[in-house]
Amino acid sequence: MKGYLSLSILPLLVAASPVVVDSIHNGAAPILSSMNAKEVPDSYIVVFKKHVNAESAAAHHSWVQDIHSAQNERVELRKRSLFGFGEEAYLGLKNTFDIAGSLVGYSGHFHEDVIEQVRKHPDVEYIEKDSEVHTMEDPTVEKSAPWGLARISHRDSLSFGTFNKYLYASEGGEGVDAYTIDTGINVDHVDFEGRAQWGKTIPTDDEDADGNGHGTHCSGTIAGRKYGVAKKANLYAVKVLRSSGSGTMSDVVAGVEWAVKSHLKKVKDAKDGKIKGFKGSVANMSLGGGKSRTLEAAVNAGVEAGLHFAVAAGNDNADACNYSPAAAENPITVGASTLQDERAYFSNYGKCTDIFAPGLNILSTWIGSKHAVNTISGTSMASPHIAGLLAYFVSLQPSKDSAFAVDELTPKKLKKDIIAIATQGALTDIPSDTPNLLAWNGGGSSNYTDIIASGGYKVNASVKDRFEGLVHKAEKLLTEELGAIYSEIHDAAVA
C-alpha cells in the first residue's frame, strides 16, 4: 500500500543530532489515539511543549529528519539483502505548524522506532496518531427547499408568508474574509461574484479545485449572492479534504494554521494602512472525525488568534462531545434543524452543541459549472449558516483602519452574543442536556448594538401565557359552576 507502510522490527541506527535526548525528560511523551476514528497507518502529529521557540523547533525538525533518514537507509539495506523484498521507505516530515504560538509541532510518516526516539525528546508534549476526517453531509436526502436563510431571519416558525423571505442588512459581510476549510471552492461560480479565490491546497499532489462539491456548497451558504447569509464577504478556499470528501487530521491542522496566518497578516496590513476596509475574518469547518486533542487545540488556538470559527456538531445522532472539532471549547459548535423546527434526525447534540441552524434540504452552490446548484443535508450545512452569521455581524462593525473603530468584537464576545440573542425553545426533539437555541440574524437590522440589546426571544411565550391564563379562568369558572350545582343538590336534599 503506497504511502501507508507496515512497521519494521529492525533496530534503528540513530544519527548524530543537534540535541541530546537523555534523562532530563520526565518520562516518555504519551501517544494519543481515538477510539472512534480510522487511523492513518504510521502517521503521527507531534506537539511541542510551550517553551519551544522557533529556533529549537527548527533544530528538532533537523534532528528528526536525521534519524528518519538513518532508518530509511537501514530499510534500503534490508531490501537489497532480501533481493528487493522488504518494506518500503517511510516518508518522513510532512508539515510543520505554528498556530499563533499556541500550538507548535509537526506531522509526518515515521517508523515506530523513530517515534520512540521522538517520545523521549524533552521538547515533546504529546504525540497523536493521525486519523481520517470527513465531511459532515448526509447524502440520503435530496430535495429542493431553499428555506434556511428565511428561518434565521424570523423569530417564529416559517409560514406561507415568510417561507422565502430573508431579512438582512444589505452590507452584510462587507470587509470580512471567510475561510472555508474543506474540499475547496468552485471560485468561478456566478453566485460568488468574483469574491471567491483560491487560498491553499494542503493535501500533497492535489489540484487547486473542488472535485467534491461540499466546500462549494458550504461557501454558497456563507457568502453567496443568492444563497448566502453574508452576501458581500470574501471567500478563501483552504483545501484540506480530497475529492472523496476525506482527509487527515494533520492536513486539517495545517489548513487551520494557514488560515490563521493569512488572517493575522490582514490584521497587520490593515493597522499599517496597507489595506482599507478590512473588518475581520471567520472560518467554517464542516468536517470531523474521532476525538483529537490536536485538532481541538488547533481550532482553539485559531479562535484565540482572532479568527471567528464555526464547526459542525456531526451527523451521528450522538453526543457531540465525542467528536472533534465539535468538542472544542472556543468555536461555535452547530447542530442541524429542519423546516418544521425539529432537531434533524442525524444531528449530534449534547452540552458541546452551542446552537442550531438549518441543516436539512439546504440549496446552495455546487461544482460542474458556473451556475450549478445542489440540495444536500447535514450539520455541514448548518455550520456555514453560523459562519455566515459571524461574518455578517463582524461586518456591522467599523473597519480596523477606521477613525470610528471601537473595541474589537472578539470571537469570545461574538459567540456569547450570538447565543444570547438566539431564539429559545423553538425546536422539538432536543435532549435535556442540549441548548434549545436557534440562530437569529437580527431580522434585517444593521445596528449591532440594537440587535444585541434586544436579547433573546422565547417562542410563543405570550401565547403560552394567554393559554395558561385561559386555563386558570376556565378552572375558576368550572369550580364556581360545580359549587353552585352542589349547593342546589344539597338544598334539594334538605328540603
Swiss-Prot record:
- Annotated Peptidase S8 domain ranges read 146-452
In this chain the Inhibitor I9 domain maps to 43-136
Question: What residues are glycosylation sites in this protein?
Answer: 284, 447, 460
GO biological process annotations for this chain's record? asexual sporulation resulting in formation of a cellular spore; pexophagy; protein catabolic process in the vacuole; proteolysis
Its keywords, alphabetically, are: Allergen, Glycoprotein, Hydrolase, Protease, Serine protease, Signal, Sporulation, Virulence, Zymogen
Q: What is this protein called?
A: Alkaline protease 2
Propeptide residues according to the Swiss-Prot or TrEMBL record: 17-136
